[in-house]
Amino acid sequence: MDLVLLQNKLDNLSFAVLFVTMLVYWGGLAFPNIPFFPTLGTAGMAIANLCMACLLGARWMEGGYFPISNLYESLFFLAWGVTTIHLLAEWLSRSRLVGAATAPVAMGIAAFAALSLPDEMQSSAPLVPALKSNWLMMHVSVMMLSYSALIVGSLLAIAFLIVTFGQPVELKGSSIGTGSFRKREPQAPAASTASNLDEGLSMGSAQATAVLTPVSTPQAPSFSLNRMSLAESLDNLSYRMIGLGFPLLTVGIIAGAVWANEAWGAPWSWDPKETWALITWLVFAAYLHARITRGWQGRRPAYLATGGFFVVWVCYLGVNLLGKGLHSYGWFF
């Protein structure tokens, strides 16, 4: 069996399937009454996941080592991780919006790996002595899975902001809510609130931070119950995916420190990759701290997770391509 030819076919097939799957998910949002779109999208993600798993398996058989030693391999491992976390998130939520957010990212990763990287970066090569260690699988695979979970969680936070138009909302279970959906309204003039509220309560309601019965205004459109239910689902699912990715990131950083100490005699050298991994850890630690101890929900943690989305990409790809250090792939410099 020609493993190189098989890999070439599988990486192009993965890209093609993900591209079609992205269109299917977007079509499902545009035409929600067509019943087979969600099932077709899930099937497409599962097929792409299987194709990339076979690609990585063939790569492993060809090179004789776990295939996460260069940019091409790590990109497909990341895309495989994103599709795996997607399938978990979609199973938990049953929402077609999950695929509409994650499929374009998975497709973009596969396209970059299959169509943009030079041929010499796509070919398998013997490992350098420093990488011939069991820590390669332990450290890098866990880091890549953490990136996958954090990326999916951040994408769901971005989807939450889109669904709510970036408006402040109080969700079920909020530390400041009462167990029902409420939208925070700007302070309305007394003339407009008098027609909706009892005269004896109008002065108190003018200073309240939330109105139990929202008043539609040009600045603050009211939301339907379905939209608010979707927003709550996205907020909760984003929290759970980031809650999955953060421990993996922690374990991956610790494993990397142990490996570095074994290979170079120092657990931490402030390499650009190490520095940005620490920044990523701090961003998502702040996210979880705000949610767990401060009771944040909705817009504020979603903005923090959105920032974390870009930090993850700088940590993974930006530093590797542009930075100087032990983790640089040296494509641009």
UniProtKB/Swiss-Prot annotation:
Family (UniProt): Belongs to the CcmF/CycK/Ccl1/NrfE/CcsA family.
One annotated Gene Ontology cellular component of this protein: plasma membrane-derived thylakoid membrane
Membrane topology listed for this record: Multi-pass membrane protein
GO molecular function: heme binding
PANTHER family cross-referenced by the UniProt entry: CYTOCHROME B_B6 PROTEIN-RELATED, HEME EXPORTER PROTEIN C
Protein name: Cytochrome c biogenesis protein CcsA
Keyword line: Cytochrome c-type biogenesis, Membrane, Thylakoid, Transmembrane, Transmembrane helix
UniProt cross-references to InterPro entries, sorted A to Z: Cyt_c_assembly, Cyt_c_biogenesis_CcsA, Cyt_c_biogenesis_CcsA/CcmC
